[in-house]
Amino acid sequence: MNILKFLCINCPANSYNGSGNVLKKNLFCCRFLAFLIALNILFAFLFGIAEKTRIKSGANVVNTTPSSPLPTVILDAGHGGEDGGASSADGLLEKDLNLSLALVMRDILTANGIEVILTRETDTLLYDRNVDFQGQKKRLDMAARLKIANETTNAMFVSIHMNTYPHPSCQGVQVWYSENNEASFELAKTIQSTAQELLQNENDRTVKRSGSSIYLLRKLECPAVLVECGFLSSPEETALLGDENYRQQLALTLCMGILRTIT
């Protein structure tokens, strides 16, 4: 199942609710479909130019595989287990939202031919229960996530998190990038712009360097970003994030940003 089929299955046929207002979900689907069509037209146009050039030059096609292999995308659902991360006023936990998004993203990317590794698939922190972990759970958890990335060839690391801020008016996706690999900036920029284009037209945030403030991005050498998917301090955005349909839209958007970067 490719991303277009996934989108069609998860978009209802009706376009209006009882009050006659266009449903946000359908607006997202229409916008997303239009974007995919435009992207396919662009690819077809570029392929046509390349094919004409090849024919004119008399070149023979020997190998049609990509010149460089697609990366293995590591989806890192932040927090887990005893570490709930941020929480909303009504008790929505960051760790649960992170995992929910990562699982949907895995299915979308896998359906589109991308190899995916999850740092966690359940509600747990990553530490060895057979050793003395007293007071070291978070450190061991970070080390385990780092090890997964470092042991993966041609990795691309995308960490999924939620945001919080004292002012409840703050909303929107915010992407941070590692400075250790120049491809991180392009990945972050593409995910951020895709979110703004397809889901959050009012979001005027720009990508940010992680510096030394984000442990994993500071340590990783592969392309690596951290996506703050929304503010649990915002009642309005919390309501959206708690809705499964919105999370599917958000997961699709993030995957589209990844796919635009690597394909």
Model-predicted segments: where are they?
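Catalytic-site microenvironment of enzymes
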Residues: N2-T263
